[in-house]
Amino acid sequence: LESKIQPNIIIGVLMLLLSLFSVSAQHINTLNVRLNDENKELNIQQEFTYLNDSKKTLETLYFNDWANAYSDKNTALAKSFAEQFKRSLHLAKDDERGFTNILTVVDDDYRGITWERSSGKDIIKIFLNKPLLPNQTAKIFITYTVKLPPNKYTPYGYSNRNEYYLKDWYLTPAVFDGKWHLYSNKNLEDLHTGVTETTLNLIYPENLYMTSNYRVLGNSKFPSGQQAQLEGKRHKSCELIFTPLNTFTTHVTPHMTIRTDITATKYDAVLQALSIDRVTEFIYKNLGKYPHAQLLVSNIDYSKNPLYGLNQLPKFIRPYDERFQFEMKILKTALTNILEETLYLDPRKEQWLNDAIANYLMIAYVEEFYPDQKLLGKLSKIWGIRSFNLAKMGFNEQYPFVYLGLARKNLDQPLITPNDSLIVANQKVGNKYKAGLGLSYLASYIGKGKVDESIKTFYQYYQLNRVRVLDFESILKRSADQDIDWFFNNYVYSDRIIDYKIKKVKKTEDSLKITLKNKEGTVVPISMFGLSNDSIVSKYWFSNIEKERTVTIPRNNEERLVLNYDQKIPEFNQRDNWKSLGGFLSGNKKLKFTFLQDSENPYFNQIFYTPVLEFNIYDGWTPGMRLHNKTLLKRPFEIDVSPSYSFREKAFVGSGSLSYLKYLSKTGLYFANYRVSGGTRHFNVNSRYSTFTPSIRFGWRPENLISNKRQFLSFRYVNIFRDLDENLPDLRNDSENPDYSVFNVRYAKVDNNILNYSSLLLDFQQASKFTKISAEYEYRKLFDNNRQFNLRLYAGKFLRNKTNSDFFSFALDRPTDYLFDYGYLGRSEDSGLYSQQLIIAEGGFKSFLDERYRFSNDWILTANSSVNLWRWIELYGDIGLVKNRGLKQKLVYDSGVRLNLVTDYFELYLPLYSNNGWEISQPSYGEKIRFIVTVDIKTLTGLFTRKWF
C-alpha cells in the first residue's frame, strides 16, 4: 500500500509547486468597454500583454474573435448552422448580424501592426513588428467595436426585452504549445484560450442590472449610466448578463458563492437555499475548493446544456418533485461551469473528460440522495403506465439507455472525436452520457473510492493550469490495482461494441462451469451476478476474454445468472445475458403484449400493439391494430404487421414486413437491410391490389458523420396481384393480365444540404413485357442574396416495350404508380380533388396537358425548375420532350406559382401558362391547382429529427 501511495504524494507536491510557480505565468488583459444600448454595440479599448511561455520565438500571434462569427453567410458558424438545417443566420438582414470592426492595432511604441482574418473570419492573425522571444512579453493596444446580433441564432447577443448575454465577446489569445490551436466558433461552447488575468472597466446603461462570472470590485452610478470594475484572475472569457430586472440572487455557502437566476416556483426560497448548500457541499466533497470568487449559474447556461428528457415537458405534466429537479438543474449547470472555468483542457478535442467528470458526479449524486428516483418520476406510479418496463427504470438508467439508442443506430462515435466532428445528438447527449457512464463502469470495476480520489486529485492539482487527458489517465492508472488500459484503448478511444453472452452452464453438486462468449471481440471486463428470488447472492468480474472462456464458480443457491445486471456497462445487447438454472422450460422467455411501445425487457419476448387508423378514398377509414416488436431501442430483426378493416369495402386490408438490418461498419458500406414486405388495399371500387416484395438495400456514408451525403443501392422484386371489378371502365391496364412482377434496381446518391442540395437517382426495371431505365437529378441552391433556385432533370427510355396500354408508361404529370410506392390518397382518380394531388416523379409537370402527351411509351426528357420571389413564394417552370412510338416528339411546357410552405411536406402549385394557354383565365381554375401533402407520421417525424442525426 505504501508503494502505491508514496508516488502519488510526491507527484501531488510537485504539481502543487508547479501551480504556485505558474501563477505569474499568464497573459495580462485590460479592457475599457462601453455598452451602447441604442446601437447594440460595444466600444472597446483593449491593452493586452502577451507572454510567450513557449520555447519558440514568435513572429505572429493569433486571437479568437468569436463575436465576428455572426458577420455573414460564409463564416464557420453559418456553415455549421447549415449542416443542422438552420438557415436563420444565412437569411439574416445586414442589421441583424453581429461583427467586429477593428479600428487600430498598435504596439507599445504606438507603431501600427498588420493583421488579417482567417478563412473562418473569427480568428485574427497579428504580425508582430519584432520577434517575441521565449519568456518575453509583447504589449498590444487594440481599439474596436463589436456589433451585437439578436439572440435568435444563439443565446449570445440582445433580446427584444432589452436583455444582453455576452460570452466570448472580446479578443482572447489562442493557445500556443509548440503549435497554434485555432478553432472557429461553431456554437459548441468550446473557446480555447490561454491563462489570463483580466481587468474590465465597464460603462453600461443606468436602467440595466449587471451579473458576471468575474469578481465585481466596484459598481457606481453617474448621471448617464453606471460604471463597474471587474476582475478575473486566471479566468477564461468574461461572461456578462444585463437585465432590466434584478433576477439574480447570491448564495454564500461554506465552500463557494453562487450567483443564480434558476428558481423553482413551487419550491420555497429557503428550501432552495438549503438545496444549493447541499449541492455545493457535494461538489466540494468530490472536487475540492473552487478557486474563483464566485460561480455564475444562469438559466441561459442551463438552457444550453439542459437535463434532456421528461423535465422538458410543459410544467403542468412535470414528472419530478420540485426539489429534485431544482437540485439537478443547479448541479448540472454548476459542474459544467466549474470544469469549464478551471480546467484548461483542449475543449474541442478533450471535452469528453469534462463531460465524464460532470456526468459521473451527477450519477453519484442521484445514487447518494435519490437512490429510488425513477426515470419517469411520478408518472411511474400512474395506472396504465406503471406496468411498462420504462416506468420501472431508475433515473440513472437513462445513461446507458440514451447512449445505446444511438449505438443501435450505428451513430455512436469515440469519446476522443473532436466536438466539431460529432453529430448533434452525440455532441449534446450521447457522448456526454457515454463518458459519465464510462467512469461509473470503471468505478464498479476498480472501486468507487479510487475513481473518486483520482478525480479529486486531478482537479486539485491541475486546476487553472494547462492540462491534458494523459494527466488524468496517469493518475487513474496509479490508483488502480488492476490493469485499466482497456478503459482507454477499448472504451474511450474506440467506438467498438461491447457485447457478451452466457453461452452455456454446466452444473455440478458444488459448482457451476460457465462458458462466456465475447460476441464482438471488444476486450473489457464483464460482471456476472447470481440471483435468487430477484436478490443478488453472488457477483464476479471476468476480464481478458477475447473470444470464449470457461470459468468455474461455487454454487450459492443461484436460480439465475445474469451478466451486467446493474447495467453499469453500456452493453449493446442484453437479451442473451441470462441463464436460468431451473431446467429447460424455465429458460424459455414468455410472450408479453404491451400497449404502444416500451423499453427493452431482456426477460420477455415483447410484442407491442397500437390502434391505427388510415384513409384512402376507396377503403375509407380503415381502423386496425398494429403488432410489432420494435422497442424504444432499435433491434436488428423487426416484424411489423397492421391488419385493418375497410368499412367502405367491408373487407380486411393491411400491410406487414419482416426486416433484418446488419450494420457492417461506421463508414463506407455501413449497412445491409434484408426485407420482405407485403400489403393489400383497394385502388378502386371493389378492386383490390396485393403486393409481395423481397428486397435488399445497401448504404454508404463518408467518414465525416456530420456530412449529409449518403449513397444507396437496392434490389427488389415487386409482385403485384390485382382483383378487378369487371363492371368498371378500363383502368389504363391490361385487364386480361392483372398480375405482374417487376425486378427493380435503384442507385441513389444524396447530399442533403440546406444550402446546396443535390441528389441523383438511377433506376432499372425489368418485367415480362418491358425493360426501362431512367435517371433523375435534383439540385437546390440558396444564394448569398437569399434567392433559392431549384432544378430537377428527368430522362427515361424503354429498351423494350410490348405493352398495349399506358399503365407502365412514363408519366408527364401524374405517375400511375404501378409499383405502389407513392402515398396517393386516390390513386385511380382522374377528376376531383384527389386527382390534383401532386407527387414529383417522372415528368414532374404540374399542368394537365393534352392526353396524347401525358404519357410516353418510348422516351421522355423533362426539366423542372423554380426560383423564389419572396420567402416561400416561388415561380416554377417545366419544359420537356415526350416521344411515343409512331409519333414525333412533342415539346411540352408549363409555368406557374409555387407556394413552398414546407419543402417536400406541404406545397401548392398554381398554374399560369402552358401548352393549354393562359390557364389562370380558363374555366374551372380550381381544378387545375395541384398540391403536395404528407400525412405519413414517420415522414413528418423526419422533418423534426433530421438535424440531430
What do the PLM-derived regions correspond to, one by one?
Residues 291, 420-421, 425-508:
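Amphipathic alpha-helical substructures
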Residues 355-437:
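Acidic/His/Gly-enriched intrinsically disordered linker/tail segments
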Residues 85-104, 110, 116-117, 122, ...:
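Extended, low-hydrophobicity, Ser/Thr/Pro/Gly-biased non-transmembrane segments
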Residues 899, 903-904, 926-949:
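Outer-membrane beta-barrel "beta-signal"
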Residues 200, 248-353, 357-369, 423, ...:
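Juxtacatalytic substrate-recognition/specificity segment
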Residues 211-212, 294-295, 451, 484-485, ...:
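Beta-strand-rich binding/interaction modules
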Residues 675-686, 742-867, 949:
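C-terminal outer-membrane beta-barrel translocator/porin domains of Gram-negative envelope proteins
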Residues 534, 542-543, 551-555, 564-669, ...:
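Outer-membrane beta-barrel initiation region
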